[in-house]
Protein backbone atom coordinates (compact mmCIF):
# COMPACT_ATOMS: atom_id res chain seq x y z
CA UNK A 1 0.00 0.00 0.00
CA UNK A 2 1.44 3.39 -1.08
CA UNK A 3 1.64 6.27 1.42
CA UNK A 4 -0.88 9.09 1.01
CA UNK A 5 0.44 12.22 -0.65
CA UNK A 6 0.08 15.35 1.45
CA UNK A 7 -0.54 18.58 -0.45
CA UNK A 8 1.35 21.78 0.21
CA UNK A 9 -1.79 23.55 1.43
CA UNK A 10 -2.30 20.84 4.08
CA UNK A 11 1.25 21.34 5.33
CA UNK A 12 0.69 25.07 5.76
CA UNK A 13 -2.51 24.47 7.66
CA UNK A 14 -4.86 26.17 5.21
CA UNK A 15 -5.85 26.66 1.63
CA UNK A 16 -4.46 30.17 1.24
CA UNK A 17 -1.47 30.51 -1.07
CA UNK A 18 1.81 31.75 0.39
CA UNK A 19 1.90 35.29 -1.06
CA UNK A 20 -1.68 36.01 0.03
CA UNK A 21 -0.98 34.69 3.52
CA UNK A 22 2.19 36.76 3.88
CA UNK A 23 1.02 39.96 2.26
CA UNK A 24 1.58 41.94 5.48
CA UNK A 25 5.28 41.16 5.32
CA UNK A 26 5.87 42.74 1.90
CA UNK A 27 5.98 46.49 1.52
CA UNK A 28 7.47 48.07 -1.57
CA UNK A 29 8.81 51.55 -2.11
CA UNK A 30 5.83 52.71 -4.17
CA UNK A 31 3.52 51.92 -1.24
CA UNK A 32 5.77 53.96 1.04
CA UNK A 33 5.56 56.93 -1.31
CA UNK A 34 1.78 56.47 -1.68
CA UNK A 35 1.44 56.64 2.09
CA UNK A 36 3.61 59.76 2.10
CA UNK A 37 1.31 61.44 -0.43
CA UNK A 38 -1.75 60.47 1.61
CA UNK A 39 -0.14 61.81 4.79
CA UNK A 40 0.54 65.13 3.07
CA UNK A 41 -3.07 65.32 1.85
CA UNK A 42 -4.37 64.50 5.35
CA UNK A 43 -2.22 67.23 6.90
CA UNK A 44 -3.47 69.74 4.32
CA UNK A 45 -7.06 68.74 5.07
CA UNK A 46 -6.50 69.27 8.81
CA UNK A 47 -4.89 72.67 8.18
CA UNK A 48 -1.39 71.61 9.24
CA UNK A 49 0.56 72.95 6.27
CA UNK A 50 4.03 73.15 7.81
CA UNK A 51 6.46 71.65 5.29
CA UNK A 52 3.83 70.09 3.01
CA UNK A 53 5.56 71.50 -0.08
CA UNK A 54 8.96 70.19 1.00
CA UNK A 55 10.72 67.77 -1.30
CA UNK A 56 11.98 64.45 0.01
CA UNK A 57 15.56 65.75 -0.10
CA UNK A 58 14.79 68.95 1.85
CA UNK A 59 15.48 69.24 5.57
CA UNK A 60 11.93 70.45 6.23
CA UNK A 61 10.59 67.10 4.97
CA UNK A 62 11.24 65.73 8.45
CA UNK A 63 7.79 67.06 9.45
CA UNK A 64 6.24 64.57 7.01
CA UNK A 65 8.29 61.61 8.19
CA UNK A 66 7.59 62.48 11.85
CA UNK A 67 3.84 62.61 11.15
CA UNK A 68 4.01 59.22 9.42
CA UNK A 69 5.95 57.66 12.32
CA UNK A 70 3.39 59.00 14.83
CA UNK A 71 0.46 57.48 12.91
CA UNK A 72 2.09 54.34 11.55
CA UNK A 73 0.52 52.06 14.17
CA UNK A 74 -2.99 52.80 12.86
CA UNK A 75 -2.15 53.14 9.16
CA UNK A 76 -3.06 50.51 6.60
CA UNK A 77 -3.17 50.03 2.83
CA UNK A 78 -6.12 48.39 1.09
CA UNK A 79 -4.99 45.32 -0.84
CA UNK A 80 -6.75 43.92 -3.89
CA UNK A 81 -9.75 45.04 -5.89
CA UNK A 82 -12.46 43.93 -3.47
CA UNK A 83 -11.25 46.34 -0.70
CA UNK A 84 -11.74 43.72 2.04
CA UNK A 85 -8.11 42.98 2.83
CA UNK A 86 -5.75 45.43 4.46
CA UNK A 87 -2.00 45.62 4.86
CA UNK A 88 -1.26 46.98 8.34
CA UNK A 89 1.82 49.16 8.36
CA UNK A 90 2.69 49.25 12.06
CA UNK A 91 5.27 46.50 11.67
CA UNK A 92 7.08 48.33 8.87
CA UNK A 93 8.68 51.17 10.85
CA UNK A 94 12.18 49.96 9.97
CA UNK A 95 11.29 49.89 6.26
CA UNK A 96 10.06 53.49 6.40
CA UNK A 97 13.22 54.60 8.17
CA UNK A 98 15.37 52.83 5.57
CA UNK A 99 13.51 54.40 2.63
CA UNK A 100 13.62 57.88 4.12
CA UNK A 101 17.32 57.53 4.96
CA UNK A 102 18.16 56.79 1.31
CA UNK A 103 18.03 60.50 0.59
CA UNK A 104 21.26 60.97 2.49
CA UNK A 105 23.14 58.47 0.33
CA UNK A 106 24.55 58.49 -3.13
CA UNK A 107 23.50 55.81 -5.61
CA UNK A 108 26.89 54.16 -5.14
CA UNK A 109 26.39 53.94 -1.36
CA UNK A 110 22.83 52.67 -1.80
CA UNK A 111 24.04 49.94 -4.16
CA UNK A 112 26.70 48.75 -1.74
CA UNK A 113 24.25 48.80 1.18
CA UNK A 114 21.73 46.73 -0.79
CA UNK A 115 24.38 44.36 -2.12
CA UNK A 116 25.77 43.83 1.37
CA UNK A 117 22.32 43.18 2.81
CA UNK A 118 21.58 40.48 0.25
CA UNK A 119 25.03 38.89 0.37
CA UNK A 120 26.36 40.10 -2.99
CA UNK A 121 29.83 41.45 -2.37
CA UNK A 122 31.11 41.23 -5.95
CA UNK A 123 31.79 44.54 -7.68
CA UNK A 124 30.02 45.36 -10.91
CA UNK A 125 31.50 43.58 -13.90
CA UNK A 126 33.78 45.58 -16.11
CA UNK A 127 32.51 46.85 -19.42
CA UNK A 128 33.63 44.81 -22.38
CA UNK A 129 34.35 46.43 -25.70
CA UNK A 130 32.77 44.78 -28.69
CA UNK A 131 33.09 45.11 -32.44
CA UNK A 132 29.86 47.13 -32.49
CA UNK A 133 31.42 49.77 -30.25
CA UNK A 134 34.42 50.01 -32.57
CA UNK A 135 32.18 50.48 -35.60
CA UNK A 136 30.26 53.25 -33.83
CA UNK A 137 33.51 55.09 -33.19
CA UNK A 138 34.46 55.18 -36.89
CA UNK A 139 33.47 58.30 -38.84
CA UNK A 140 30.25 58.08 -40.76
CA UNK A 141 30.33 57.50 -44.50
CA UNK A 142 28.93 60.98 -45.14
CA UNK A 143 31.84 62.57 -43.35
CA UNK A 144 34.33 60.55 -45.41
CA UNK A 145 32.65 61.64 -48.66
CA UNK A 146 32.22 65.22 -47.49
CA UNK A 147 33.84 66.77 -50.58
CA UNK A 148 30.73 66.17 -52.69
CA UNK A 149 28.32 68.99 -52.04
CA UNK A 150 24.65 68.31 -51.44
CA UNK A 151 23.74 71.14 -53.81
CA UNK A 152 25.62 69.46 -56.68
CA UNK A 153 23.80 66.20 -56.14
CA UNK A 154 21.59 65.09 -59.05
CA UNK A 155 18.63 64.86 -56.68
CA UNK A 156 18.85 68.58 -55.90
CA UNK A 157 18.98 69.92 -59.45
CA UNK A 158 15.87 71.82 -60.43
CA UNK A 159 15.55 70.19 -63.80
CA UNK A 160 15.16 66.82 -62.10
CA UNK A 161 12.46 68.02 -59.71
CA UNK A 162 8.81 67.62 -60.66
CA UNK A 163 6.88 70.86 -60.13
CA UNK A 164 4.16 70.66 -57.53
CA UNK A 165 0.67 71.05 -58.89
CA UNK A 166 -1.82 72.47 -56.43
CA UNK A 167 -5.39 71.33 -55.92
CA UNK A 168 -7.83 72.70 -58.51
CA UNK A 169 -5.14 74.23 -60.68
CA UNK A 170 -3.85 76.49 -57.88
CA UNK A 171 -0.07 76.53 -57.69
CA UNK A 172 1.71 77.16 -54.41
CA UNK A 173 1.87 80.87 -53.57
CA UNK A 174 -1.20 81.66 -55.65
CA UNK A 175 -4.53 82.77 -54.32
CA UNK A 176 -7.71 81.09 -55.51
CA UNK A 177 -8.89 84.26 -57.30
CA UNK A 178 -5.63 84.57 -59.27
CA UNK A 179 -6.00 81.02 -60.56
CA UNK A 180 -9.55 81.75 -61.79
CA UNK A 181 -8.39 84.87 -63.61
CA UNK A 182 -5.62 82.90 -65.35
CA UNK A 183 -8.08 80.17 -66.35
CA UNK A 184 -10.49 82.74 -67.84
CA UNK A 185 -7.71 84.51 -69.74
CA UNK A 186 -6.53 81.17 -71.21
CA UNK A 187 -10.04 80.36 -72.48
UniProtKB/Swiss-Prot annotation:
Alphabetic keyword roster: Transcription, Transcription regulation
Transmembrane segments: none
Annotated stretches, region: Disordered: 1-24, 119-187
Pfam family, one: Baculo_LEF-11
GO biological process: regulation of DNA-templated transcription; viral life cycle
Function: Involved in late/very late gene activation.
Name of protein: Late expression factor 11
Biological source species: Lymantria dispar multicapsid nuclear polyhedrosis virus (LdMNPV)
